[in-house]
Regions:
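Walker A/P-loop-proximal flanking segment of P-loop NTPase domains
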Residues: 1-46, 50-59, 121-126, 383, ...
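Conserved NTP-binding/hydrolysis module of P-loop NTPases
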Residues: 8, 67, 72, 79-103
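The catalytic "switch" region of P-loop NTPases
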Residues: 8-10, 148-241, 259, 263, ...
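Mid-core helix/loop region of P-loop NTP-binding domains shared across ATPases and GTPases
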Residues: 92-151, 161-170
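Winged-helix-like regulatory helical subdomains adjacent to P-loop NTPase cores
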Residues: 213-216, 220-327, 333, 364-370
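Active-site metal-binding core of divalent-cation-utilizing nuclease and nuclease-like domains
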Residues: 416-443
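Conserved catalytic cores of phosphodiester-cleaving nucleases, focusing on short active-site segments
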Residues: 437-439, 443-454, 470
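Nucleic-acid nuclease catalytic cores
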Residues: 460-464, 468-499
Length: 515
């Protein structure tokens, strides 16, 4: 079977394009050689499981170690019953060992032991009879919680001093969150009698996104296998859109090569990558859908809502910010502050949040189109004003984020517009005081800026300056500035909507819409 780009589960080197795990985790071999216990944490679907399965295989094939990746996930339903969790986990481990290890390296039958001791007893018995030093990577450690998580961590700590003769030579805990957060899931550090729930760890490592050169290396594997070329611009665009997030990098390439350009004599261009991006965002595959589900959690909403509106981040618990970082939903900008992790997520988040408003939209005739189906900006303005007068206020209730409900309803309307053959692009950031939208429909390009007025000071002057800069980047001479007035005691938004023309500092004609 020819190799392809993988988006479902761990990669398998015989059928998937993939990067070497030793390249992605260059310091890990030295940690293992030094009999260290360690943590590897990273967001979901960045290749943790793939890398560790491949590394275990490399270590075993070298003849130096018996190395294996084992999962703890089957113990997740038994958070209050360590005994049941241990039995489920150990059954899974026996099956995995039969699949991944040669017969002469299989573990013995697990010895009988009391609940709360079975994991440690099994690892001890295996280490004692192993003909090579035993290296174990325990995946999905943060699937466990409460009593079961405490029990597993304590058993590993208890056996640590007996390594390597009577306990594994090296153990790696693999999960989404860092060790500092295990105590949160286990009910607090006082229940572990230590300030750290895993104080035997030597290092806490993370698996980073692909670099630009790694994206190029991955895509080059396809070129070498098929002859189909990814242009330099396509590789750069893929890296820009994904920030190197491995699932997204693979997903774009999969769409490009298996759906959009099946003819291997034709190159994959930047335009093809952009088309692949639109398909992914519209489809919202499992990876994107799982992130979207998180948006309704209060600790996520508290941080994402001000990012969308351009407000300052309120006082939030450090653990909430770390949670979003560990999810891979946001990242720390080199310039300071939190930003959405990559441009694809930046598109997905407002689309998902405006979906409820989209589903609540009444049937709207596309009166914004000319007879030749081109977009008419003046007709679009009139259609929006009429829509807002009739439906704006009721639709605000359908928006999941109250503070930016007007933004979401406006975006729902604009999505109805571009569904006929256009695109929306958004820019937003903490503390920017705005959201910028670029609407493209055929040859028509429109720049729109959204601002919220919460205080007496009118944001018009600042908005004109900001919109001027945005329109300059788009090469446009006109744009919309939409100001949503959220001060108390005002008439309904639909009743007070108005428009006026203003000239920006750069001499551009701006349509100011107030509501």
């Amino acid at each position: 079977m020819p190799k392809h780009f993988n988006t479902a589960g761990p990669c398998q080197s015989d059928i998937h394009y993939m990067l070497s795990p030793t390249v992605r985790l260059p310091d890990l071999k030295a940690l293992i050689d030094g009999r260290n216990y360690f943590i590897i944490h990273a967001p979901r679907q960045v290749g943790k499981t793939t890398a560790m399965i491949a590394l275990a295989q490399e270590l075993t094939d070298s003849g130096e170690y018996t190395a294996i990746m084992l999962s703890l996930e089957v113990g997740a339903p038994f958070s209050q019953d360590p005994g049941m969790a241990e039995r489920a986990i150990l059954d899974e481990w026996q099956e995995s060992a039969c699949v991944y290890l040669p017969t002469n390296l299989h573990p013995p039958r697990w010895p009988p032991s009391q609940p709360g001791r079975q994991i440690g007893a099994a690892l001890a018995s295996w280490a004692k009879v192993a003909t090579r030093p035993l290296v174990v990577f325990l995946d999905e450690i943060d699937a466990l919680a409460d009593e079961t998580l405490i029990s597993v961590l304590r058993q590993l700590r208890s056996g640590y001093n007996r390594r390597p003769r009577a306990f594994p030579h090296s153990v790696g805990l693999i999960g989404m969150r860092d060790v500092r957060d295990y105590k949160v899931k286990s009910g607090g550090s006082e229940r572990l009698n230590t300030s750290s729930p895993f104080n035997i760890k030597a290092e806490s490592l993370t698996l980073s996104n692909f670099t630009l050169s790694e994206v190029e290396e991955l895509y080059l594997q396809h070129t070498q296998a098929t002859g189909q070329v990814f242009t330099i611009e396509a590789i750069q665009q893929s890296f820009y859109l994904t920030d190197g997030q491995p699932w997204l990098v693979n997903a774009l390439a999969r769409q490009a090569t298996q759906v959009l350009v099946k003819d291997i004599t034709q190159p994959i261009t930047a335009e093809v990558i952009n088309q692949a991006k639109e398909i992914l965002i519209r489809r919202q595959d499992t990876h994107l859908d799982s992130l979207a589900e998180r948006l309704r959690e209060d600790r996520v909403k508290t941080i994402i809502q001000p990012m969308l509106s351009g407000s300052d981040l309120p006082d939030t618990p450090e653990d909430d910010r770390r949670f979003l970082l560990d999810l891979g939903l946001v990242k720390r900008s080199p310039l300071g502050g939190l930003t959405i992790a990559n441009p694809i997520y930046q598109e997905v988040i407002p689309r998902v949040l405006s979906q409820g408003s989209q589903d609540s939209l009444p049937q709207i005739q596309p009166t914004w189109l000319n007879t030749d189906n081109t977009l008419n900006p003046n007709k679009l303005l009139n259609a929006f004003l009429e829509f807002w007068r009739q439906h704006g206020e009721p639709l605000l209730k359908s928006a999941p984020y109250h503070e930016i409900a007007p933004h979401l309803v406006l975006m729902a309307f604009l999505h109805r517009v571009v569904n006929g053959g256009g695109t929306l692009e958004r820019e937003y950031a903490i503390g920017s005081g705005r959201m910028d939208i670029c609407l493209r429909y055929g040859k028509v390009v429109m720049g729109i800026e959204l601002k919220v007025r919460k205080e007496k000071l009118d944001p018009l002057t600042q908005g004109l300056i900001q919109l001027d800069k945005y329109l300059n980047g788009l090469g446009l001479d006109t744009g919309w500035l939409v100001i949503f007035d959220r001060r108390a005691g005002l008439p309904p938004m639909g009743e007070r909507i108005s428009t006026e023309e203003a000239i920006s500092p750069g001499g551009r004609t701006i349509t100011v819409i107030r509501s």
